Amino acid sequence: MMTGCVEEYEAELPESETHLLVVNGTISSGYSQFHLSWSEPLENANKGKDRKSYSIEDVKPVEHAVVTIHGTDGSEYKCTDDGAEYGYPTGIYSCNMPMLNPDVSYYVIIKCNEGTYRSTPEKPIRTPDIETLEYFQKDSLSDVEVLLTTADPDNPDKTSYFTWDYKETWEIRPTRITSIYFDIETMTRKYMTKDRQYPKRGWKFGRNEIILAGSTIHYAGGRMSKYQLLDIPRDDERVSWYYCFDLTQRAISKAEYEYELACRQAGWEMGGLFTPQPSSFPTNIRCTTSSNRVIGYVGCSLNTIWARMYIDCTKISRILPKPNKLKKLDDCQEVDCMRMTQEGKVLYDWNDGRQAMQPLVTLWGEPEDFDVRLRGATTEKPYYMPPFDE
């Protein structure tokens, strides 16, 4: 499996390799989307040199392009510019599509100020079903693995190639709970009313930021068997409580797989495709009006397969997130409590022994330990997240 982390990749490119059209997208049944951008130089990098530096962050969306999908049967579908709806350029062009004909080849034509670009016609590839999507933990000290098994392909004697996209949703909870706070107006401790209480739960979201691609070359029968898509450490907050994994599977051609593999080996990631020699990487897109080079590959899919899997926190061994260290104030005065409150600290414990000639002792915590919203969570529960009886 090809995995990695998203990092800024700076490459040195000759002038002939600059301002390249970058195409990300697939012709698909139902819905097709293309993300078009231009590679742009880092103006402040390598000053005084005749070569320019590029970064994955330095891309500019293609504006006012005309993007159409064509079939060799004469069919034609025009994509809309999503940026027109938002009022600013996005470089995203999309259109609704009928079910593709497996006997017809499809290609995309992109027209913009810099020229006309066309992809090679390809027949749509059928994606086999997902037989099982499951999680596995070898023992109580092991990470949690997300495993995939695909159904039988049309031709078990041929190697199958896939790409996967996934989305994650997970529940988080406060690492500390309190029912009290210090009221600055009355300069005393008070119990929280319901409207002041911190949320008991929150939900966070993520998706793959790396290219996930694989082949069945090392599997019998042209199908993936218990193929590891993801590895989650048992101390990761994602598996602290309830976790949901949504997977979209797409079968691709060998040529597209080789393109994805080249991206991986060059350190490319989604949203940025730059390398010292882009022209040496495989592509099925060319400029028909000039010798301008293109980065990207336009695949063609008859269908995609979706599956969902849950991880139940009670069925695995996991380590819950630890809160920050509490700050203890011995012989505390109300003015100290006011200062701590103004600094954003949260009152965790109040032990007032002054009536018995003992000091007031307070404990204070960091706000993110009490409020899941400060850890990037939403308090609006997604409809698909357990428990479902609420």
Model regions: which residues?
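C-terminal motif of bacterial Sec signal peptides marking the signal peptidase cleavage site
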Residues: 2-4
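A sequence/structural signal for flexible, mid-protein segments enriched
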Residues: 6-390
